[in-house]
A protein has these predicted regions:
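N-terminal accessory segment detector
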Residues: 1-133, 147-358, 362, 372-398, ...
């Protein structure tokens, strides 16, 4: 079997695998973003968006990989899909019982099901099971494996850890009439750039990127496809999955609620980015990896800001550069080739509002963690601590002052008191 893998492309600061950009995010962001999207279910039909966005992306990626490598044998194609799912930290399943007509899939572990239960606990009886991404992955991969049309497979979830089941399982069936789905935006509208070491910090951005991008951060058979690293459960997730689900939600809210819908989407998605920063960046800055590699470079609290921004530059989110840092008062960050703008520009074109919600919430989270909450003292990253930070008179605000999707040549974020 030829495994599906990618390479970290330093001219884009992104990991590309068979045409699809993949980025590191953890279970806190994955599950909180999904919960955020689910909060709109009374206004829009969100569940097909959560499934079909994954289906489109996986179908495109698998088709490209099979075609480029002339892989025609069905069993090898199945092994490639199983292996890539595991490698990315999504979990572990077997397609042994899946045919061109569908079949049942039993998963030994599933990131979304396991991660949701870990973060939020069990779901209520009237709530659906949570592995929407996996349902889309299975449908798209099966279509590609058997040379079926995109939208011809349906996948439902039969059991889930969040329902107190002891395993996770799914069932694939063929649609009588194929759904009309869209093509993946793939890399989108990209920008080339070069990462440099700033001259106002002892933090070695290039060295950190080199070290982190060469670390074996991957799911394995022994870990059942779960990546436990930096104090969180990591995934190498499709950036287009975050973007397609988020922006489709945004557009649906705009259609149903007008400008109020846009404002609601902005608030929800920015908060998801802030929660991501609190848990992901906070977990990283308390991890053994941070203490061994990055903390020795940090002489001041400003170096901590540079340290976590250097880490972001290894996560595939594009190029993050600090333009201005006023201790405990202000942070200005420029993002080049940000995955949010890349995807939005390719699929939707120009926007009437700034759309880089993850970066917006993430930059705000950095300042709140380091200057408001003082992550250097190793606090417990609890919900209570998060509320304390958010309600503090020292809490930071953020605005996106430039946006590529609005016609600017870069994305700029200003965090301020």
């Amino acid at each position: 079997m030829k495994p599906l893998r990618g390479n970290f492309d330093t001219q884009y600061n992104t990991y590309i695998a068979a045409g699809e950009p993949l980025i590191f995010h953890c279970h806190h962001y994955n599950t909180f973003l999904q919960a955020t999207l689910e909060d709109t279910k009374d206004y829009i039909d969100i569940y097909p968006i959560l499934i079909e966005s994954a289906q489109e992306i996986v179908y495109a990626q698998m088709n490209q990989f099979f075609s480029e490598n002339q892989i025609a044998e069905i069993e090898e194609r199945k092994q490639i899909a199983e292996d890539f799912f595991m490698f990315c930290g999504y979990g572990k399943f077997s397609l042994e019982n899946v045919s061109v007509d569908g079949g049942k899939v039993v998963s030994e572990s599933d990131h979304y099901s396991y991660g949701w239960k870990s973060k939020f606990g069990l779901r209520a009886e009237n709530e659906p099971m949570v592995s929407f991404f996996t349902r889309g992955f299975l449908a798209g991969a099966t279509e590609a494996i058997f040379n079926l049309a995109l939208g011809s497979m349906e996948c439902k979830q039969l059991s889930c850890y969040t329902k107190n089941d002891s395993f996770v399982s799914f069932e694939l069936t063929k649609n009588i009439n194929s759904k009309k789905l869209s093509n993946s935006p793939k890399q989108g509208t990209t920008q080339n750039h070069t990462l440099n070491n700033p001259n106002n910090t002892s933090v070695n951005y290039l060295g950190i990127r080199e070290a982190l991008t060469n670390m074996p951060i991957e799911g394995t058979p022994s870990s059942k496809g779960i990546i436990d690293a930096f104090g969180v459960l990591l995934t190498r997730m499709y950036s287009n999955y975050y973007c397609q689900t988020s922006y489709r939600m945004l557009k649906k809210l705009e259609e149903t609620m007008g400008s109020d819908g846009l404002m609601l989407a902005d608030q929800l998605l920015t908060e998801a980015g802030h929660v991501c920063a609190f848990n992901t960046f906070g977990g990283i800055m308390q991890s053994a990896e941070w203490n061994g590699l990055i903390k020795p470079m940090c002489q001041t609290r400003e170096d901590w800001v540079h340290g976590i921004v250097a880490v972001v530059n290894a996560f595939g989110w594009g190029f993050w550069e600090i333009l201005e840092l006023e201790p405990a008062k202000k942070l200005v960050v420029k993002v080049t080739n940000g995955y949010e703008a890349n995807s939005y520009l390719q699929t939707l074109g120009k926007s009437s509002i700034p759309i880089s919600f993850l970066a917006k919430g993430g930059t705000k989270g950095i300042m709140n963690l380091i200057y408001n909450g003082d992550i250097t003292t190793q606090p417990s990253l609890t919900d209570e601590y998060y509320s304390e930070i958010c309600n503090s008179p020292k809490a930071f605000s953020v605005r996106q002052t430039k946006c590529r999707a609005m016609g600017d040549d870069q994305d700029i974020f200003e965090v301020y008191l």
